[in-house]
Amino acid sequence: MNSTVVNQGLRTKGGGSLKKVLVFIESLDGGGAEAILRNTVSVIDKSKFDITVVTETDNERYTDEVRSYVHHRSFTKRNGSVLNEIVNKVIIKYSLLASEKAVRNNLIKGDYDVEIAFCEGYATKVIGNSGRKNCKKIAWVHTDVINHPWSEAIHGGAENERKCYENFDAIVCVSETMKASFVKKYGMAEKVHVVYNVIDDEETRIKSEESVNLDLPRPIFALAGRLTQVKGYDRLVRICAKLRDMGYDFSVAVLGKGEEEENIKKLISENSLDERIKLFGFQENPHKFIKNSDVFVCSSYAEGYSTAVSEAVILGVPVITTECSGMGEIFGGEDCGIICENSDEALLEAMKKLLDEPSLLEFYKEGEKKRAESFSMASRIRAVEDFIENI
């Protein structure tokens, strides 16, 4: 007799067996890869997959939401007590010093049909070197391993990272340009694939309609993302100082937080840009800020497949971005803005161009209307499901 069992949002239809899937990611505390994982597990077919997401810690930005969709476990639990903090520190220390096999067996635990390392670095190192042979392993790569090889250090060098990736059955890059970089550096072309990020285009549009008063003079350039060195906020400040000195009127809204925040504040102050550049910090809903700006700027030195740029295109906000992995694919041949050379000078000229020719904004918005249709969440989640099913 057929029956339906509901468990933490997972629905099992009698007569069929679910594919058990482990997804390991260090954190759910904001960030592009974390948001993409949240989007993915929110809509993936629960009648096909029994998914468990494992992280190092709990009580992070997306923890409760992810837990409402799928199973979630973490190495540590937070309850605020002194003893709890001591225990958590011991567990994290163990996770860093123990072998990958020990971490997999003693902290992640469980048996799965498919094991996914959802981000390069530590997650990839643990899943790739776990020694497990009775499952399929997938490594998800969200960065350009040539232009931003940050994860090499986690493995102790590029050669160790290459050997780790050889232990995977499949490697997923989130853009064609990232795939090209990966294959150029590490080879393994036969098992490197492209699966585009799952972006909630409908939620992006709905949230963008919420009211917000930026209280800034126009035109407004908006930036969104973690305040880290690779995002290039430092050079954006220097460029704004030059534009100001050239006599241009504009303002900048920066959304996000991160380790570079104090340095950026210092740069803003040193360049007397406090009235021009406003840091709004982390925002639960960045979409309403972006929608109410005139231009979205990505000043990054390197990207994988930018969720923020994709969302700007969905919202019809013209984009200026440095040349990074995935940008051409996001534009998809449409005139969505300017992709400039990845240099301070080129970014300056791109911003200057739109200040000189504001009529271009309407032209780019028309291109974005055509392109926005390609970000369908339904089609992208089907691609993810098909990939996991057929691995």
Each PLM stretch: what is its role?
Residues T177, V198:
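Carbohydrate-associated surface elements
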Residues E100-I108, V114-N134:
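An aromatic- and histidine-rich active-site surface loop
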